[in-house]
From Swiss-Prot:
Protein name per Swiss-Prot or TrEMBL: Enolase
Gene3D superfamilies cross-referenced by the UniProt entry: Enolase-like C-terminal domain, Enolase-like, N-terminal domain
GO cellular component: cell surface; extracellular region; phosphopyruvate hydratase complex
Locations listed in the record: Cytoplasm; Secreted; Cell surface
GO molecular function: magnesium ion binding; phosphopyruvate hydratase activity
Pathway given in the UniProt record: Carbohydrate degradation; glycolysis; pyruvate from D-glyceraldehyde 3-phosphate: step 4/5
Bound cofactor: record note: Binds a second Mg(2+) ion via substrate during catalysis.
Alphabetically ordered keywords of this record: Cytoplasm, Glycolysis, Lyase, Magnesium, Metal-binding, Secreted
Length: 424
């Protein structure tokens, strides 16, 4: 493979979808090819995520500036990787990890290392005149089933809902584009239903509606009504998913939500009953990230019926994923590149999940940009699932639109596993 020498590295401060600063990195190669990547930011974060370096200068952006991360890229990182081969991704990422030297990227910042890592991959792909998804992965390409967030709650919205995300999964579609079409129709029907009931149709951080409804079951009933109003059914076209973000309402050893206090055992039973009542096939962060016994009990009780996704539990970290596999906690891993800080480590987490029979779901963050790298990672890795928000807000739609472009470019080679095979 021809060497693709890095000639320049540049970073700048830009804004994410919440109006807070984030870092954007540009890499240029000696042949003139360039790569640009912008890094997202989370609101609901796991305690063991790689560190997002912020300036803590209250005089700028309420302390959330990222000039220190920009300086990391333009200084120590640039000095080390200029002259290196952009086509050797693992070597670049190894340098980034070693330069930082901490367990959680706290010296340089995971926002700095990820920006560089992704921009390097994009520059190399552009140099080879190859789409990023082809550059990152070989073989058959599977389009992901989208987990589309239509109602927001928790820390992603200013309403009374304790659960963070209520999602539809278009498992009955035959193509990705059809999945987006029928989901958009449900989204617009949901808007109409909310309006008729006198609810606000304002949207939350991830583009889903944020009506001031008070219960999980009311949210689920509204979604089912919207599916049926759009001319579809839960039996043939859609299933439901939840991101509970249980760590956000775990306090003093109990789960406090909807005016109740439940033990781990009681919460597991609550989920069991909810799954029996509604067509829910995926539940994310159902237990607090440190409630290992709760996770084990949940997995025993529901692991053969429902996709149980660990986000805060695993934070895209191979050591934590390995522990979860060994102790039989959850059966799926949410993959967020900025939780770990490099592309190589992201793919290692995906591979570890797959090799051990766990599913992997590529995910955005609540603070996003127009960057579409995760769309390419989803296709390149053949994960089969992606979580990137609702069907509003251009920062979310950018990912869906990019996936439709990828599907179009693949033509007949684009595979979308529908129906019961969605978990393949």
């Amino acid at each position: 493979m021809m060497k693709k020498t890095i000639s320049s590295v540049f970073a700048r401060e830009i804004l994410d979808s919440r109006g807070y600063p984030t870092i954007e990195v540009e890499i240029e190669l000696c042949d003139g090819a360039t790569g640009r990547a912008a890094v997202p930011s989370g609101a609901s974060t796991g305690k063991l995520e790689a560190l997002e370096l912020r300036d803590q200068d209250e005089k700028r952006y309420c302390g959330k500036g990222v000039l220190k991360a920009v300086q990391s890229v333009s200084g120590v990182i640039a000095n080390k990787i200029i002259g290196m081969d952009a086509a050797n991704q693992s070597a670049i990422d190894k340098v980034l990890i070693e330069l930082d030297g901490t367990k959680n990227k706290s010296k340089l910042g995971a926002n700095a290392t990820l920006g560089v890592s992704l921009a390097v991959a994009k520059a190399a792909a552009n140099s080879f005149k190859t789409p990023l998804y082809k550059y990152l992965g070989v073989g058959e390409k599977q389009m992901p089933v989208p987990l589309i967030n239509v109602i927001n709650g928790g820390v992603h919205a200013d309403n009374k809902l304790d659960f963070q995300e209520f999602m539809i999964l278009p498992v009955g579609a035959e193509t990705f584009s059809e999945a987006i079409r029928i989901s958009a129709e449900v989204f617009h029907n949901l808007r109409s239903i909310l309006k008729k009931k006198g609810y606000s149709t304002n949207v939350g951080d991830e583009g889903g509606f944020a009506p001031n409804i008070g219960s999980t079951e009311e949210a689920l009933n509204l979604i089912i009504q919207a599916v049926e109003s759009a001319g579809y059914s839960m039996k043939n076209h859609f299933a439901l998913g939840l991101d509970v973000a249980a760590s956000t309402f775990y306090e003093d050893g109990v789960y406090k939500f909807e005016n109740r206090e439940l033990t781990s055992e009681e919460l597991v039973q609550y989920y069991f009953d909810l799954v029996g009542k509604y067509p829910i096939i995926s539940i994310e962060d159902a237990m607090n990230e440190d409630d290992y016994e709760g996770w084990k009990l949940l997995t025993v009780k529901l692991g053969n019926k429902v996709q149980l996704v660990g986000d805060d539990l695993f934070v895209t970290n191979c050591k934590l994923i390995s522990k979860g596999i060994e102790e039989k906690m959850a059966n799926a891993v949410l993959i967020k590149p900025n939780q770990i800080g490099t592309l190589t480590e992201t793919f290692a987490a995906i591979e570890m999940a797959k090799l051990n029979g766990y599913r992997a779901i590529i995910s955005h963050r609540s603070g996003e940009t127009e960057d579409t790298t995760i769309s390419h990672i989803a296709v390149a890795s053949n994960c089969g699932q992606i979580k990137t928000g609702s069907l509003s807000r251009s920062d979310r739609l950018a990912k869906y639109n990019e996936l439709m472009r990828i599907e179009s470019s693949l033509g007949e080679n684009a595979k979308y596993y529908c129906g019961l095979a969605w978990t393949s």
